[in-house]
Amino acid sequence: MSHRAYEDTALPIGFNQTLSQPYIVARMTELLLRDGRPEKVLEIGSGSGYQTSLLAQLVDQVYAVERIKPLLDKSRKILRQLKYRNVMFQHGDGSLERHSYAPFNAILCAAAPVSIPEVFLQQLMPDGRLILPVGKDSQVLKMITRKDDEFVSETFETVRFVPLCEGTVR
């Protein structure tokens, strides 16, 4: 697969999951940083750890949740070898569970729910932002910003992500 390393395309990482294309990783990171550097970020669907490693260089603390344990174990090992100290990993279902370190300045979700899960919104600090793909067959990239008790939604480009699934895989 190394011969595809410079392609702007999603790549398979096993378990019917993909590493997002580099453009989308950069775009989601750009949106995350648009209004300043968030201190505390929840990443749902950390997969290979690629986006996690980028976030770890840009924010104070990353909480990475992955539902597929072998992917989580592999990314944890790699990021520890690279001496990232500001990432906490958790094996779990980020689509249903409120994270124990909530609330967050930002949440980045790397899988597409059909609609925005309420549990995501509940975990945002005031002025916090949620960046995620939304939709079943046709998906769009969205950013939802919490303004007091209201949520302001912005829609960006059409995207294609794996679906957000419930449950965990050991």
Regions found by a protein language model. Give the residues of each.
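N-terminal auxiliary segments of SAM/dcSAM-dependent transferases
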Residues: 1-3
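Conserved alpha-helix/loop element of class I SAM-dependent methyltransferases that forms part
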Residues: 5-9, 15-40
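Alpha-helical hydrophobic/aromatic positions enriched in membrane-embedded helices and signal peptides
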Residues: 13-14, 58
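Conserved nucleotide-cofactor-binding alpha/beta core module
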Residues: 33-152
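Substrate-binding/catalytic lobe of Class I Rossmann-like enzymes that use SAM or dcSAM, i.e.
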Residues: 142-148, 152-170
